[in-house]
Amino acid sequence: MAEAEGSSLLLLPPPPPPPRMAEVEAPTAAETDMKQYQGSGGVAMDVERSRFPYCVVWTPIPVLTWFFPIIGHMGICTSTGVIRDFAGPYFVSEDNMAFGKPAKYWKLDPAQVYASGPNAWDTAVHDASEEYKHRMHNLCCDNCHSHVALALNLMRYNNSTNWNMVTLCFFCLLYGKYVSVGAFVKTWLPFILLLGIILTVSLVFNLR
């Protein structure tokens, strides 16, 4: 009897290994990119849906940008990424940027807003947009850049009330990031082609 019990114990299968902790999966490239685009306050940037929280956004204007690549159409986004842009006389667009989706964005820091009151960023964007609903659009003097400048002045971004179209154009050129390679090509290729044509024609006439 003892031998039978000993034999049965020897025939029992080995116990299963103890459960291990679940392995942590490495983040995918898309997840890594999304973390890089993560906005302040936990609101994520979404290029496909044109959501750029706390950003100034820019897109090329057909023909005009072909000759002057640093000149384009500008808007400013709310804390949730909704774009507001002065799109024409007495009209400020919401979530439907004139001239197409943004090609470039300039990420700002909401901690640099010095205006008092709750939700100062969105309040400034709203007040600037309401003001420009009563203004005539002027390409040279009072345009989309001026609308964005007013919003930044109202919120006292970087503790300044001296924002204007020139400073915005410069900082957007310096700190702006293209949303994709295609956006970069869309902005600069027409200018490069036109420049090439002008140089070629000039060279041909000089060689005659």
From Swiss-Prot:
Residue ranges, Extracellular side: 1-55, 186
Membrane-crossing segments per the record: 56-76, 165-185, 187-207
GO cellular component annotations of the record: dendrite; membrane
Major subcellular location class: membrane
Tissue specificity field: Widely expressed. The highest expression is observed in the brain.
Membrane topology term: Multi-pass membrane protein
Highest taxon, organism lineage: Eukaryota
Name of this protein: Transmembrane protein 222
Zinc-finger as UniProt keyword: no
Keywords of the record: Cell projection, Disease variant, Epilepsy, Intellectual disability, Membrane, Transmembrane, Transmembrane helix
Alphabetical list of InterPro entries matching this protein: TMEM222/RTE1
Compartments, as annotated in UniProt: Membrane; Cell projection, Dendrite
Membrane side Cytoplasmic: residue ranges: 77-164, 208
Chain segments carrying region Disordered: 1-26
Disease cited in the entry: Neurodevelopmental disorder with motor and speech delay and behavioral abnormalities: An autosomal recessive disorder characterized by global developmental delay, impaired intellectual development, speech delay, delayed walking, and behavioral abnormalities. Some patients develop spastic tetraplegia with inability to walk independently and never gain proper speech. Affected individuals may have variable additional features, including poor overall growth, hypotonia, tremor, ocular anomalies, seizures, and non-specific dysmorphic facial features.
